[in-house]
UniProtKB/Swiss-Prot annotation:
<dbReference type="GO" id="GO:0006388">
    <property type="term" value="P:tRNA splicing, via endonucleolytic cleavage and ligation"/>
</dbReference>
<dbReference type="GO" id="GO:0005737">
    <property type="term" value="C:cytoplasm"/>
</dbReference>
<dbReference type="Pfam" id="PF07823">
    <property type="entry name" value="CPDase"/>
</dbReference>
<feature type="binding site">
    <location>
        <position position="44"/>
    </location>
    <ligand>
        <name>substrate</name>
    </ligand>
</feature>
<feature type="active site" description="Proton donor/acceptor">
    <location>
        <position position="119"/>
    </location>
</feature>
<dbReference type="GO" id="GO:0004112">
    <property type="term" value="F:cyclic-nucleotide phosphodiesterase activity"/>
</dbReference>
<feature type="disulfide bond">
    <location>
        <begin position="64"/>
        <end position="177"/>
    </location>
</feature>
<dbReference type="InterPro" id="IPR009097">
    <property type="entry name" value="Cyclic_Pdiesterase"/>
</dbReference>
<feature type="binding site">
    <location>
        <position position="124"/>
    </location>
    <ligand>
        <name>substrate</name>
    </ligand>
</feature>
<feature type="disulfide bond">
    <location>
        <begin position="104"/>
        <end position="110"/>
    </location>
</feature>
<comment type="similarity">
    <text>Belongs to the 2H phosphoesterase superfamily. CPD1 family.</text>
</comment>
<feature type="active site" description="Proton donor/acceptor">
    <location>
        <position position="42"/>
    </location>
</feature>
<dbReference type="GO" id="GO:0005829">
    <property type="term" value="C:cytosol"/>
</dbReference>
<keyword id="KW-0378">Hydrolase</keyword>
<dbReference type="InterPro" id="IPR012386">
    <property type="entry name" value="Cyclic-nucl_3Pdiesterase"/>
</dbReference>
<keyword id="KW-1015">Disulfide bond</keyword>
<protein>
    <recommendedName>
        <fullName>Cyclic phosphodiesterase</fullName>
        <ecNumber>3.1.4.37</ecNumber>
    </recommendedName>
</protein>
Length: 181
């Protein structure tokens, strides 16, 4: 019997068409100075264990069904301790944002002990603390009105995301759904 291929999938909430270009421009500018792979602006709402493509699509469809578009607000530009959380926009943990994360986590049977930290990554990179601080300052120089910025997340994307691949070349968007207003 042939073994069915299983992959790690992520569910991303995508910013609306109005705010996406602003984030892309900021990400592009940071990447040109500090290097790092290109990726679309997104807020990760769930990461699965290994799933087959069929399992992932079914879970994704059911997650999309029960979720409405929602608003997120930037708390501040922050830095993290690993590659995929190098420099990011930390989002306010409003009930709306936290419920969206919980909703998707439940549909994907995510059993994580880490509390949900909603954020929109600006840069994936291996930087020193000094470089991260510089990138953080640069983000504010490029866009001084980030703190308190509110934007809509109106789509979900199902993505195959092998976290071992730091080039992101194997990352693939499998499906996108528009959320009800």
């Amino acid at each position: 019997m042939e073994e069915v291929k299983k992959d790690v999938y992520s569910v991303w909430a995508l910013p609306d068409e109005e705010s996406e270009p602003r984030f892309k421009k900021l990400m592009e500018a940071l990447r040109s100075e500090f290097t790092g792979p290109r990726f679309v602006p997104h807020v990760t709402v769930a990461v699965s264990a290994y799933l087959t493509a069929d399992e992932a699509k079914k879970m994704f469809e059911s997650a999309c069904d029960g979720l409405k578009a929602y608003t997120a607000t930037v708390d501040r530009v922050s830095t993290g301790t690993f590659f995929f959380q190098c420099v990011f926009l930390l989002l306010q943990t409003t009930p709306e944002v936290m419920e969206a994360g919980e909703h998707c986590k439940n549909h994907f049977n995510c059993s994580t002990t880490t509390p949900y930290m909603p954020h929109l990554s600006l840069l994936y990179a291996e930087l020193t603390e000094e470089e991260k601080k510089n990138a953080q300052e640069k983000a504010y120089t490029l866009d001084s009105s980030l703190d308190g910025l509110s934007f809509r997340l109106n789509r979900l994307a199902l993505c195959k995301t092998d976290t071992e691949d730091k080039t992101l070349e194997t990352w693939e968007t499998v499906a996108v759904c528009n959320l009800n207003p």
